[in-house]
Amino acid sequence: MNQPNSLYLALLIEAKWQNPEDFHFSSDFAKHWLLEQGSLSRRLARHCQHLTVELMRNEKSGVGQLTMQETQGLSPEICLIREVVLSGDQTPWVLGRTLIPETTLADQPYDLATLGDIPLGLTVFSAEQVERDALQVAWIETPQGRLLARRSRLWMNHKPMLVAELFLPDAPIYSRESV
């Protein structure tokens, strides 16, 4: 993993999450991105010719390797940790970290552990039963300035996973920030 991604990931894991009603959004445009209930992957794909996934990590981890914040949204069990960078036309846009409990991996129509470079959102939002709850947002201070992030719990066929996403400096969420 390269140095900027390592730093971004560490900052994302330690984010100070807030409920949307308590958060100061920089614009209505950013608010719509952060509160998106559907697939972020699909939304990103509409802003580029080629949406790609760089898989940085895809391995099971014990409960002891998760933060207290992360375990609050899930049952305490071994999770698959999937960390990726989503890029639009070769420009990094979003760093994602997903925690998928072993019980969520079981009995699904898709093998979430072997997605590789397929965007998770495209797979999850293809399932019959998908819901998002516990949506939170954050500003994350980086050497490049403040960046926006969101975290939510996705339910796929009534089984949870925790998804955190950091919008990198060139992400489309910032394209209308000054408008």
From Swiss-Prot:
Catalytic activity of the protein: chorismate = 4-hydroxybenzoate + pyruvate
Pathways involved: Cofactor biosynthesis; ubiquinone biosynthesis
Swiss-Prot/TrEMBL keywords: Cytoplasm, Lyase, Pyruvate, Ubiquinone biosynthesis
Cell compartment(s), UniProt: Cytoplasm
Domain of life: Bacteria
Binding site for substrate: 82, 120, 165
Pfam families, per the entry: Chor_lyase
Gene Ontology terms, MF aspect: chorismate lyase activity
Gene Ontology CC annotation, any one: cytosol
Biological process terms in GO annotation: pyruvate biosynthetic process; ubiquinone biosynthetic process
Top-level EC class as recorded in UniProt: lyase
Chief site of localization: cytoplasm
EC nos: 4.1.3.40
Record has Nucleotidyltransferase as a keyword: no
SUPFAM superfamilies noted in UniProt: Chorismate lyase-like
Keyword Cytoplasm: yes
InterPro entries per UniProt: Chorismate--pyruvate_lyase, Chorismate_lyase_/UTRA_dom_sf
Functional summary from the UniProt entry: Removes the pyruvyl group from chorismate, with concomitant aromatization of the ring, to provide 4-hydroxybenzoate (4HB) for the ubiquinone pathway.
Family: Belongs to the UbiC family.
Protein's recorded name: Probable chorismate pyruvate-lyase
